[in-house]
Amino acid sequence: MSLYRSPSAALLKSPSQAAFGAPFGSMSVADLGSLTRLEDKIRLLQEDLESERELRNRVERERADLSVQVIALTDRLEDAEGTTDSQIESNRKREGELSKLRKLLEESQLESEDAMNVLRKKHQDSCLDYQDQIEQLQKKNAKIDRERQRVQHEVIELTATIDQLQKDKHTAEKAAERFEAQANELANKVEDLNKHVNDLAQQRQRLQAENNDLLKEVHDQKVQLDNLQHVKYTLAQQLEEARRRLEDAERERSQLQSQLHQVQLELDSVRTALDEESIARSDAEHKLNLANTEITQWKSKFDAEVALHHEEVEDLRKKMLQKQAEYEEQIEIMLQKISQLEKAKSRLQSEVEVLIVDLEKAQNTIALLERAREQLERQVGELKVRIDEITVELEAAQRELRAVNAELQKMKHLYEKAVEQKEALARENKKLHDELHEAKEALADANRKLHELDLENARLAGEIRELQTALKEADAQRRDAENRAQRALAELQALRIEMERRLQEKEEEMEALRKNLQFEIDRLIAALADAEARMKSEISRLKKKYQAEIAELEMTVDNLNRANIEAQKTIKKQSEQLKILQASLEDTQRQLQQVLDQYALAQRKVAALSAELEECKTALDNAIRARKQAEVDLEEANGRISDLISINNNLTSIKNKLETELSTAQADLDEVTKELHAADERANRALADAARAVEQLHEEQEHSMKIDALRKSLEEQVKQLQVQIQEAEAAALLGGKRVIAKLETRIRDLETALDEETRRHKETQNALRKKDRRIKEVQQLVDEEHKNFVMAQDTADRLTEKLNIQKRQLAESESVTMQNLQRVRRYQHELEDAEGRADQAESSLHLIRAKHRSSVVTGKSSSKIFVTEDDY
């Protein structure tokens, strides 16, 4: 029983301890070597178990042979009883010879008692040897129990440390949940910003269409300007012809001078009326200037007010024409001869005054344009400085992004190594589970066989009791036969010879059986000594290994506590930084709202940015699709990782690595959030710069529109001058050289002003083109900042997903550790139950041996008694 108990107890302890100790190993090659050594030890224990099973089977076969021999002896005893019954009558005749046989019987009894004493001493010596061996095995079992209690104490301490780690993990999970909530809020804000960007893109498309229409109108105005230049050339030729005609008309004018003096008084009255009309015209022109200033502020009223003002000018012109016609009719009545000349003169004077007023307006507008150009140049310089700052920030962000990418590559490489180590540990763990299952099955078979042996021993004990009762009955019959022995001397003589022969055979069989038993006992003692030596070496090696593992676990627990304290400090710092970043984000949102309001005022002049925003939108869609694909890939990878971690998450070293990775991931998340906020601020600044550039462009375009309107008015005035020149040519014969010289100088001044205005218009157009190119460059920078923002957002999303994965891994590792603890407790209960069953089996075996010794003693005594009777 002790031979069976020790290896089974060792087998129960070693796999359970291996199953408990294996999760606390590290993922190095040394731990894999220790796992292989454990497998070798388990194989050796299994081989020892097989050898002990073979020995047990051999003992069972010998016990079966002995039971067969006992049955044969009982059969012979029954035959002997039958022969005694048949010879009772003959023994009655030989009662006289009984006295002689009694003496011989007493002598034979003394001899049998001496032989029984010798056999009893030998049996007691063998029993003492067995008891010594059993005591030694019990001492070894006590040592093993003490080792088991020590390991249980260590298990309790490890459970306490695991509970502390679970509490720390719970606090870390709460902090991670807060970070997730903050990340979700930031994601919602980013979505709102994306919606605003989409709305701005739609508005920019509309402005692009309006800008295209304006460009078409500018092209038409350029064509009209070319036509006007051609007309100016033709007018110059006509002016030369008019000069020649004026020389001819000068001679006629001297003749008409006297007549003109008479009409001069009437012309003075007409001039007073014309002065009043010019004052009214100047008032109207002043109103027109006020209307132009209001047009710049109120764009929606521009067209209506221009139309209204144009109608007022037309009405005034019509009134002037009517008055002029009335005056001409009066002059024709007064002086029919000079009516045409005076009409032309009055008309030319009124138009010259109008041109003077228009020229002053043009000079004022030119001065305004010059001031606006200087302001635009200053703003362009500021934009250049800001763009340089944006480029510097962009380069810094790109460097930070490259550093983050390098860190991500390192983390990916470490993650792949961890996955490979997890797979190897999963395979090793599966092998250990299979071997543990086989050992449990072998233990169940051994328990079943032990139960069968107990039943067999009980049956043999019953048979031995029956044999003892039969022997008692035979003794009573022997006493009856002693009274009748005198009548059976002849039969007893023959029976004595037969019994001596049988007794000799029995003695030979008992001697052979004793030798076989002694040989088996010696062999079992040697096997027990070998098993004991192996068990001691195995226990010492396991003790050293567990002590080393406990030291490693203490070191890992200390490192884990330090890492947890550092992680809590970093979490506090990051929470403060997140609060600061949230405040800055709110400020940036308010600034963005202001920028959007300003951008709404400049909706019509952002057409050049529509194509770039569309490209940004497509890039954003592509980034979103890539992000979704990455999330799908990440979910698949998470599935594979969860499958691997569900097997080996009971390893404390992996848990330590996961917690360190959690801290590094939180640090990376904080860095990425900082970069995200910095990129958001840079994008907001770039958008503000773009909005200011768009406003400047809008002002330049308004100035260009004013210049175009002025150019149109000048063209109309030139046309009117052409008509007036044609009329003057008709009336040149009646005019004077002074008026013609004034008109020529006025025309030259107007031409130079027109050339200067066209040159400035071209310069403003070139400046507008430069501004457009600069705005496009700024928009490209804004697009790059937006791309960086999208990339940073993707990295933030990936880090949040990784944080969730690590949280799940921590939860799974805790569940696996709890399962392992429950499994260790279950193994302990099973070990205690097995030890109790082994003790019960040992006690029952002692009882069976005692009963067997008593049955052997009674059997030998009965056989000696029959021998003495046969002698008589």
Curated annotation (Swiss-Prot):
Phosphorylated on serine residues in the N-terminal non-helical region. GO terms for molecular function: cytoskeletal protein binding; protein kinase binding; Rho-dependent protein serine/threonine kinase activity; SH3 domain binding. It is found in: Cytoplasm, Myofibril, Sarcomere, A band. Disruption phenotype: Defective extension of body wall muscle connections or arms towards the ventral nerve cord. Double knockout with madd-3 results in severe muscle arm extension defects. RNAi-mediated knockdown causes an accumulation in the proximal gonad of endomitotic mature oocytes in 22 percent of animals. Expressed in body wall muscles of larvae and adults (at protein level). Expressed in gonadal myoepithelial sheath cells (at protein level). Keywords: Coiled coil, Cytoplasm, Disulfide bond, Motor protein, Muscle protein, Myosin, Phosphoprotein, Thick filament. InterPro entries: Myosin_tail, XRCC4-like_C. Residues 1-31, 856-866 are annotated as: Nonhelical region. Its main location: cytoplasm. Residues 294-376 are annotated as: Interaction with unc-89. It comes from the Eukaryota. Residues 32-851 form a coiled coil. The keyword Ion transport does not apply. One of its GO terms (cellular component) is cytoskeleton. One of its GO terms (biological process) is Rho protein signal transduction. Structural component of the muscle thick filaments which is involved in assembly and organization of sarcomere myofilaments. Involved in ovulation. Plays a role in the formation of muscle connections, also called muscle arm extensions, between the body wall and the motor axons in the dorsal and ventral cord. Belongs to the paramyosin family. Homodimer. May interact with unc-89 (via SH3 domain). For most of its length, paramyosin appears to form an alpha-helical coiled coil and shows the heptad repeat of hydrophobic amino acid residues and the 28-residue repeat of charged amino acids characteristic of myosin heavy chains. However, paramyosin differs from myosin in having non-helical extensions at both termini and an additional 'skip' residue that interrupts the 28-residue repeat. The distribution of charged residues is also different from myosin heavy chains. This is Paramyosin. It comes from Caenorhabditis elegans.
